[in-house]
Amino acid sequence: MGVYILRRLVSTIAVMAMVGIFIFLLLRLAPGDPAAVIAGPTATEQMVANIREELGLNEPLPVQFVHWASDVLRGNFGASVFTGVPVLQLLSQRLEPTISLSVLTMILSVTVGVSFGVLAAWRSGGFVDRALATFSAIGYSVPVFVIGYILIYFFAIQTRWLPVQGYTSINQGVAPWFLHLILPTVTLSVPYIAFIARITRGSMLEVLSEDYMRTAAAKGASPFAMLFHHALKNAGVPILTVIGISFAYMIGGVVLTETVFNVPGIGRLVVDAIKNRDYPIIQTVLVLISGLYVLINLLVDLAYTLIDPRIRY
């Protein structure tokens, strides 16, 4: 196990190095100039050139990359080119809404998705199974922002049951915090519920056809014990993989969802940074997301040994 973890850590360093190079080049080669955005539409070429020099954008790309990479290795992710506020400080101010939305979405997606998939497999071809097929088709095909606007129209504008937009900190009360997160959470959960449910159903169907499941039924095991003690445990590896992938990919959905519901989280910060060509913010967020994705994959691989003792590294 120790050798495997060490090998994965070494490969992680290599992956993060390549990701850093790709992110740096992608932003630098993309259209747009942060100096021109800062200077404004009425600025002269000399003013833009002076700002580029202040930001170090007039240096060769290899030199810019070395400066940026060395700062990152020291834990210095720079400051916003517009506000001058350190990037980590900006992220810490936006962290609570994003974490709240992500955690609630993951809880809802896993709970409903796994339960839906188990029931669909247990009654394959029945009403629940057909309902899952319909729901999955909708969840896969309809964009997150469309789902968000539909929910806003029915549950916020027409019925006025829930807030339309915005966010209330949990420090100001659990009830308003939760009410403001219901619509964003449901919106972001729809595609992940569909994804997790379909994979759970397929994995459960494969396990339910095994001989030991028929043996358990012959011994008088209850349906609950057969489903959740025997079948779900043995079907857990692909389900855990899907949950890990869903959590890692959720960041992209968070950006759209926070924009639709005007949630002041990291997603909104990234959108504003892209509009303003604020390189330090974009680079930092992309690097942190990449690191989180790699870490989640490592944790999922290690969790396999807890679900299935036959797996050894």
Curated annotation (Swiss-Prot):
Localization: Cell inner membrane
Domain called ABC transmembrane type-1: residue spans: 95-300
Gene3D superfamilies attached here? MetI-like
Q: Name one GO cellular component term.
A: plasma membrane
Membrane topology term: Multi-pass membrane protein
**Mind listing the GO biological process terms from this record?**
amino acid transport
TM ranges: 9-29, 101-121, 137-157, 177-197, 236-256, 280-300
Keywords linked to the UniProt accession:
Amino-acid transport, Cell inner membrane, Cell membrane, Membrane, Plasmid, Transmembrane, Transmembrane helix, Transport
Chief location of this protein? membrane
Against InterPro entries, the record matches this protein to: BPD_transp_1_N, MetI-like, MetI-like_sf
GO MF term list: dipeptide transmembrane transporter activity
* CDD domains per the UniProt record, alphabetical: TM_PBP2
> What does the function comment of this entry state?
Probably part of the binding-protein-dependent transport system y4tOPQRS for a peptide. Probably responsible for the translocation of the substrate across the membrane.
Q: Which family does it belong to?
A: Belongs to the binding-protein-dependent transport system permease family. OppBC subfamily.
Report what the protein is called.
Probable peptide ABC transporter permease protein y4tP
Record organism: Sinorhizobium fredii (strain NBRC 101917 / NGR234)
What is this organism's lineage? Bacteria, Pseudomonadati, Pseudomonadota, Alphaproteobacteria, Hyphomicrobiales
